[in-house]
Amino acid sequence: MSLLTEVETYVLSIIPSGPLKAEIAQRLEDVFAGKNTDLEALMEWLKTRPILSPLTKGILGFVFTLTVPSERGLQRRRFVQNALNGNGDPNNMDRAVKLYRKLKREITFHGAKEIALSYSAGALASCMGLIYNRMGAVTTEVAFGLVCATCEQIADSQHRSHRQMVITTNPLIRHENRMVLASTTAKAMEQMAGSSEQAAEAMEVASQARQMVQAMRAIGTHPSSSAGLKSDLLENLQAYQKRMGVQMQRFK
């Protein structure tokens, strides 16, 4: 796996699924391929994205700044600086300085990542802030190692939280989660169907599914009534793909 592929993987792992994630993935691909060289426009686009947490925006801004060639005097962006200040906690800053001293002696991506993984996400973000504000200088490989370690820490906590929701025995939470997943799947079906004539059936199925979820929420239904909703939708989507000559069995 190449270095940039690894960085893209880690960064995307902390972004919630949805159309915005697909858009960010495309921007990262373009940046890493050298196709997007306007850092100013890229940062302005990032700043105005909804949903993303300030820290996620800070990490993406840091990655874009590391990758896109820019003029020496280009101003640092406040939204990135604020996100990478470790919540203003002096303990985070102290640890960040210690980490930075270790990273300065490191030259490899994996070496930097290993060192960084023993620190908290707050200290890692503060260390990124030091480098972003030009208060510290490390090689690009080492900076990317720091980015990936930070993303791994965040993804771990997101995974624990997600697992708690998945294994919860509360029927109301499970019911709502199934309806949310069904609704999201329906939206994805509508996007994939596009505007071809054959797409009418897939669009109809997706539209009916979304209406059903809205009705279930409006009238209040038994928690077991949502069981299988998402699976039914995916079966319809795969049947549609088969007719279109596309064989993809990886949605479940």
UniProtKB/Swiss-Prot annotation:
Pfam families noted in UniProt: Flu_M1, Flu_M1_C
Keywords: Host nucleus, Membrane, RNA-binding, Viral matrix protein, Virion
Motif (Nuclear localization signal): 101-105
GO cellular component: host cell nucleus; membrane; virion membrane
Residue numbers spanned by region Membrane-binding: 1-164
Bilayer disposition of the protein: Peripheral membrane protein
GO BP, sorted A to Z: viral budding from plasma membrane
GO MF annotation list: RNA binding; structural constituent of virion
SMART domains per UniProt: Flu_M1_C
Region described as RNP-binding: spans on this chain: 165-252
Job description of the protein: Plays critical roles in virus replication, from virus entry and uncoating to assembly and budding of the virus particle. M1 binding to ribonucleocapsids (RNPs) in nucleus seems to inhibit viral transcription. Interaction of viral NEP with M1-RNP is thought to promote nuclear export of the complex, which is targeted to the virion assembly site at the apical plasma membrane in polarized epithelial cells. Interactions with NA and HA may bring M1, a non-raft-associated protein, into lipid rafts. Forms a continuous shell on the inner side of the lipid bilayer in virion, where it binds the RNP.
Subunit structure: Homodimer and homomultimer. Interacts with NEP. Binds ribonucleocapsid by both interacting with genomic RNA and NP protein. May interact with HA and NA. Cannot bind NP without genomic RNA.
Miscellaneous section: Most abundant protein in virion. When expressed alone can form virus-like particles in transfected cells.
Similarity field: Belongs to the influenza viruses Matrix protein M1 family.
UniProt-recorded name of the protein: Matrix protein 1
